[in-house]
Amino acid sequence: MFNDPAIVSRFRNAKGLEPCEQHLFQKFIKQDDDVLDIGVGGGRTTPYLSAIARRYVGVDYSQAMVEACHEGWPELDFRNCDATDLSEFSDTTFDVVVFSFNGIDNIGDDSGRARCFAEIARVLKPGGVFIFSSHNARLLWILPVLDDVRGLKIFWRIAYSIFKSVQILIRTLWGGAFLAGRGYIFDPVDGGLKLFQSTPETIAPEVSAAGFAIMETVGSRWPSVKARLLTPWYYYACQKCR
């Protein structure tokens, strides 16, 4: 799916950081840190992270995404790499690892997620920072963005938002993730892609098992929306503690 030219084009056209990302990056990433950017996609996070890092490496399991990044930033280091196997990197190599835009949720089973967390912990230096995001299993409604529309377009955007929210909620309830606070669904937004969903309460033991402590949790619509049922995903800033 992520080698599809249309998908690659969509990711290449995504620009800038979300306010929640900007907040966590500014707070936890220091000038001249060595940064590994996992699931780099079309390079949305590359301008910010590469500018602040002493060494920046972007990786993605889609070769087409990696090629798109090479075209955009030929001077930077981009590699085709699976997040569950970072064996090309030595232990304690990076100060910071970033896995943005819920990329970790594309790993299709719990054992794969555990390998990913373990590999990230391995390549981080002692006290290193891991910033990632994960879909909210208890999302009730995806609030539409209405700042750029007028008239009937407002109605259609609200209607579309309700339609997609209902689709996701039905799948979350059907699969048990809403009640359990974690689980897998087949996402209607991205063509039936299998995605993991979680809550801050269910993420905490998962990252703890890999040797991380959560320092801060921020909702994806921060600072304007803080209600849990209206938060599509959460960002987590974690520190390697063992």
Q: Language-model segments: which ranges?
A:
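A short acidic, Gly/Pro-enriched loop at the edge of an enzyme's catalytic core
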Residues: S87-V97
